[in-house]
Amino acid sequence: MLTQLLSSYSDYHYKFLVFSSEHGAEEEQQYIEELLSYQIEGLIVLSHTLSSKQLSSYQIPIVAIEREAEYISSVTTDNYMGALQATTLLIRDKCDILIHINVNVEKAVPAYDRIRAFKETCKEYQVPYDIDLSVSGNSYQEILNEIRRIFTRIEEKYPNQKKGIFLSNDTYANMFLNLIFQKYRELPSFYEIIGFDNSPIASEAILPITTVGQQIDIIAQTAMELLVQQMEEQKKRSPKPLEKPVHKQIAPVLIRRNTTS
C-alpha cells in the first residue's frame, strides 16, 4: 500500500513524510503534532491507534484506509462482498462444515464485515458453520500456536466431514495449510482453504492459496483522489469543507488457486 501511495507523486506532485509508530497512542499523537509543525496539507492514516474522532480534531484533510472512520473520510475494500464470494465458493464446493478463523474484530472496523458476511451467507444457505475469533498474539510464533490449537480442535470436532476454512488473511491461511501438510503430506480432499488480501505469501505458499484479492492500486489511487480534492478545496479563497465524511468501497476480486476445487 505504501509503495502505491508514494508512486502517486508523478500524478499529484505532493511529497510524503512517512511515520510508523509502534508504541501506542501517545507516540502516534506526538508524530502527528510533529507533522503538523511541518505544515503538512493532508494526512493518510492506515493505523488503528487513534480514533477517527481524535483524528478529526486536527482540522486538516484526512483519509483513512481500512480502519474505523466514522468521523473522517475513508477508502476500504468491500469486505462484505469479499467474504460473500469466499463463503459462496466453499458452499458451491459442497463443504459439509464452513469455518471462519479470525481475531475478535470490533464492529466499527471495516474487516468486521468479513465475519458478518460469512455468518449471514451460511445462514441464508442453511449451511452448518463455526466461527472462531480466538486468534491472538503479537509475534509470528504466538499466532502460529493459536492457529495450531484451532487446527487441532477442528480435526477433533469435525472428523469425516469436508471442511471449508475461510481465514481472515493469507498469513493465517498459509499457517493453516502448513499444519495440514505436516499431518497429511498433502491437502486432502476433505479440506478447502481460502485466505484474504492476495498478499505474496498466498501465491508463494507450498500450494498456491485461493484468496480474496484487495485491489491495492485502486484503493491507493482513490485515497489520493479523496485527499487531494480536500486539500485543493482548502486552498480556495472561500473553501467549503465536506459536510460529512466520504466513504468509498473498492470491489475485491476472488482469485481461485489450488486450495479449492
Which residue stretches match the model-derived regions?
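Short, well-structured alpha-helical segments in soluble
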Residues: 25-39, 143-161
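Short beta-strand elements in bilobed, periplasmic/extracellular small-molecule ligand-binding domains
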Residues: 9-20, 119-144
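Flexible loop/turn connectors
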Residues: 152-164, 168-261
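Periplasmic-binding protein-like
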Residues: 32, 39-46, 99-102, 159-169, ...
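An alpha-beta-alpha
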Residues: 86-132, 239-259
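Alpha-helical recognition/docking segments in bacterial nutrient-uptake
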Residues: 1-88
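Hydrophobic alpha-helical segments within soluble ligand-binding/sensing domains
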Residues: 71, 75-100, 116-120, 142-152, ...
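Short, solvent-exposed amphipathic alpha-helices that sit
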Residues: 1-11, 82, 110-128, 175-179, ...
